[in-house]
Amino acid sequence: FLRQLNQSVYRDFPDVQTIAEESTAWPGVSRPVAWGGHSNDNPETMNGLGFGMKWNMGWMHDTLSWFEKDPVYRSYHQNALSFSLYYAFNENFVLPLSHDEVVYGKGSLLSKMPGDDWQKFANLRLLYGLMWTHPGKKLLFMGGEFGQWTEWAHEGSIDWNAADTYFHVGIKHLIGALNHLMRTQPALHQRDFDGSGFEWISADDSAHSVLAYLRHGNDPKDTLLVVFNGTPVPHHNYRVGAPQGGRWQEIFNSDASIYGGTDVGNQGFVDALDEGTHGRPYSLELTLPPLGLLVFKHVDTPAAKALPKAKAAKPAAESAKAAAPAAKKPESAPAAAKPAKAEAPAPKAAVAKTSAAPKAFETRAAEPKAAESKAAAPK
């Protein structure tokens, strides 16, 4: 029945999508009916079910589980963020943050996050940045687009009164910017269902809770470099491998002030060094914002520099400010945001190098060996 239904829908309504919410490992849910795949020689699984897409329940569960943990313990669970790439291209996946995750006492996405109010909003921005740059289409339940505090109740409305306050407006601006980025950057949508659209730079720096990866489109010029920092401290002079020399423009920073962040970043661009790392011929020396995600794109300007040169950490996200109305700040900024201000120099002990973890993490016991991630996801 399902195969016949999907065949009929796509034949008669080619602009319609059928999407399966399915939590088993049944193969070929989003493969064509005449797929020809097989599982254990079972004739029933020789053909696909013909759905256009399928929910990625594994990604949802592992990712939310990681984000709910205090940053002190996240380094022990780095593989929860990288494991989804082992199977990300087995189906045409949708990344779902649905109503199922914000009902029956589970709390809203915002309330799941650890830390004070500022850290909760920064974690939510980080989650959305990861979601929008991860292969797969996006599903976000109502209320998530502005960071509702309370979980969904079917007998009432969502909390519209909170939607126009400072940090919630920042989340709305962030979602708008991520949607614009996804529509205008081919690397974020052209190869969502193809393993060639994703490539790891580094997935195993669990001590700093850092991930770095590439997204590829059909044109090599569209390649994006994404860097993720899952700790509440900035990492200065952090070296990340790069596939090309020259200049890399910072086209997105989840810590931009228009999103409610602290404007820690890279002044809008970084010039590559000709000293390679992570198996790449070049490298970028970056300032990673606390609980922040950065997206870079190569531009045709200067060649790689011969020697590293530290730069002050201050990003440019001014284009986003022009595109969206500025939110009215409260007369007195929330106390929780004060420790994260970019203007205040970070204590020396909190400055993170690639060779040492932040001070906040130095006193804990030796970490178990992080699970290694494969260099590339299977098709």
Language-model-derived ranges and their functions:
Residues 1-154, 183-255, 262-263:
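Conserved alpha/beta catalytic core and glycan-binding cleft of carbohydrate-active enzymes
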Residues 118-121, 130-140, 144-379:
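Carbohydrate-interacting/catalytic domains
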